[in-house]
Amino acid sequence: MRRVVGKRVLEFSEAEFDQLRSQYDEVVLDVGTGDGKHPYKVARQHPNQLVVALDADKTRMERMSAKAAAKPAKGGLPNLLYLWATAEKLPPLTGVGELHVLMPWGSLLRGILGSSPEMLRGLAAVCRPDAAFLVALNLHAWRPPVPEVGEHPEPTPETVDEGLAARYAQAGWQLTDCRYLAAEEVAALETSWTRRLNSSRDRFDVLALTGKINP
């Protein structure tokens, strides 16, 4: 595994991960973390959980990974790990109990929409039975449509069962709820997209999908 600590990239072995994992009750995995603010918030709020954040762009994680590695008095969080990796080629993680994919873009968006079943199955493979998932879709990807959405129409709570839920089920994901997020809920996600999205009562910009993996 390639651990990001500021501008440094350090090798992090499976044995080191297992030793760190043994100190916590649960593992939360944030895929496509971007600037890494969301996992920092989760790790700070849940010190009993090991939070693993990964992204294909290591430079975006530099600031928050350096902060997480600092002494606790300076904002350091020993339960937070930033990894340089992609969803297509995950590090050798096991026992993930909660999976977050927030505002996916590019190949990650394509995979989360079911165009890459291998990605969905790969994510399921690192999760324990009945792991929870949260996917937050930035609906601006359909306004106008970006190439990654392909032929998938903009999902809504009314239409999600017609296609996406079935594609998820084939990969071991059970979709149980789909709803629009209010502006304050979008802000609470603490992602780099938060400041760019302006949800309103007459135009919803973020759709949240929740459910279980390996039910």
From Swiss-Prot:
Q: Does the keyword Transferase apply?
A: yes
What biological-process GO terms show up in the record? methylation; response to antibiotic
Does the record's keyword annotation contain Lyase? no
InterPro entries to which the protein is assigned, alphabetical = NpmA (IPR056262), SAM-dependent_MTases_sf (IPR029063)
As its record notes, the protein acts as a catalyst of: adenosine(1408) in 16S rRNA + S-adenosyl-L-methionine = N(1)-methyladenosine(1408) in 16S rRNA + S-adenosyl-L-homocysteine + H(+)
Enzyme class, top EC level, equals: transferase
Classification via SUPFAM superfamilies: S-adenosyl-L-methionine-dependent methyltransferases
The EC number of this protein is: 2.1.1.180
Q: Which UniProt keywords apply?
A: Antibiotic resistance, Methyltransferase, S-adenosyl-L-methionine, Transferase
Q: Name one Pfam family in it.
A: NpmA
Give GO terms: molecular function aspect only.
Answer: methyltransferase activity
* Positions contributing to S-adenosyl-L-methionine binding: G32, D55, A87, E88, L102, M103, P104, W105, G106, S107, T191, S192, W193
Return the similarity comment: Belongs to the methyltransferase superfamily. Kanamycin-apramycin resistance family.
What job does the chain carry out?
Specifically methylates the N(1) position of adenine 1408 in 16S rRNA. Confers resistance to various aminoglycosides.
Additional remarks: Protects S.hindustanus, which is an antibiotic-producing bacterium, against self-intoxication.
Q: Could you tell me what this protein is called? A: 16S rRNA (adenine(1408)-N(1))-methyltransferase
* Organism in which the protein naturally occurs: Streptoalloteichus hindustanus
